[in-house]
A protein has these predicted regions:
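A short helix-loop-beta-strand connector motif used in the catalytic cores of GNAT acetyltransferases and
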Residues: 28, 34-54, 66, 123, ...
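Conserved acetyl-CoA-binding loop-helix of GNAT-fold acetyltransferases
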Residues: 72, 78-91, 115, 211-224, ...
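Active-site/acyl-donor-binding loops of N-acyltransferases
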Residues: 116-135, 232-279
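Short amphipathic alpha-helix that is part of the acyltransferase structural core
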Residues: 1-31, 124, 133-162, 199, ...
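Amide-forming acyltransferase catalytic core, primarily the GNAT-like/NAT-type
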Residues: 94, 118-200
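Conserved beta-strand in the GNAT
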Residues: 45, 51-59, 66-71, 186-195, ...
Length: 279
């Protein structure tokens, strides 16, 4: 089988969206436009001869990289296409100076990624509330543009990579919401949420592990602004925030396993993912 891999172009977006949504990912062209704005040439199209059969995405954060979407047409699976795309993305990230690559794997794909050198870390629950009830809580300070550098440094200390390009794209978008808590000019935790007309995704959140009270206050502040929406978030299965989300009406849709190729990058903290695609 003759594979060709090239960067995903705008003319490929219709195929990419159609293929991605065979996985019930509810993606749109805007998702690939957003990925391209963050990581030009980080989205890939795989062709078998002249036929497009697969896509993959990845993003670099300095020494940390993240592998995101991987989809192969059903009739082209188990023929090496998936391995070819993952290997191509790994090489791309290595050339960008990435030392550690993370991803979130569905349980059935853990053996596949293990064969490619990834090692399982911990499991994360994908939570969903289809109609969030109103929550009353004390509002917290919104993250301002002048706070961004401090937020990026705080985030990097725990995540391990510099997510400035991602964080500023979320935090500075007026449609989204965010807040942080500081003490003596030191950030203790922050959260951001991407908000759509009828849905929202809470994350990223990073908070010092010894301050679950701060993390709870951050989440409640964001939840208070999302009433009646479909709300999603992804948490470690042993998260200090699990009880809060379950009591707010969230339930687990499915779980994934975080895996790393290279040294595990994250430090102990209270954590919500930004997305399954970007870490």
């Amino acid at each position: 089988m003759m594979f060709e891999i090239k960067p995903l172009c705008k003319s490929d977006y219709d195929f990419a969206v159609e293929l991605a949504n065979t996985m019930d990912w509810h993606m749109a062209a805007e998702d690939f436009i957003f990925m391209d704005s963050l990581e030009p040439e980080g989205c890939f199209l795989l062709r078998d001869d002249t036929n497009p059969v697969g896509i993959a995405t990845c993003i670099s954060y300095g020494k940390i990289g993240w592998f995101g979407n991987l989809v192969i047409r059903k009739e082209s699976r188990k023929k090496g296409a998936g391995s070819a795309l993952v290997s191509h993305a790994i090489n791309y990230l290595r050339q960008k100076g990435v030392e550690t690559i993370g991803l979130y794997a569905y349980p059935y794909l853990v053996p596949f990624y293990t064969k490619l050198g990834f090692r399982s870390n911990i499991n994360f629950s994908v939570l969903h509330n289809p109609n969030l009830s109103p929550i009353s809580t004390k509002p917290l300070p919104t993250i301002k543009k002048s706070d961004l550098l401090s937020i990026v440094r705080f985030d990097q200390a725990f995540f391990g990579g510099n997510r400035k390009k991602l964080l500023q794209s979320i935090i500075l978008d007026p449609n989204n919401t965010s807040c942080c808590i500081s003490q003596d000019d030191q950030i203790l935790g922050y959260v951001a949420a991407t908000v759509y007309e009828k849905a929202a995704w809470i994350g990223p959140l990073i908070c010092q592990s010894q301050r679950p009270d701060i993390a709870v206050a951050l989440v409640n502040s964001v939840l208070s602004k999302l009433a009646t929406k479909h709300v999603y978030t992804v948490i470690p299965q042993d998260s200090a925030l699990a009880e809060l989300f379950f009591s707010a009406g969230f339930s687990e849709d499915f779980f994934v396993t975080r895996m790393f190729l290279g040294q595990t990058s994250t430090k102990n903290c209270i954590y919500l993912t930004e997305s399954l695609e970007r870490g």
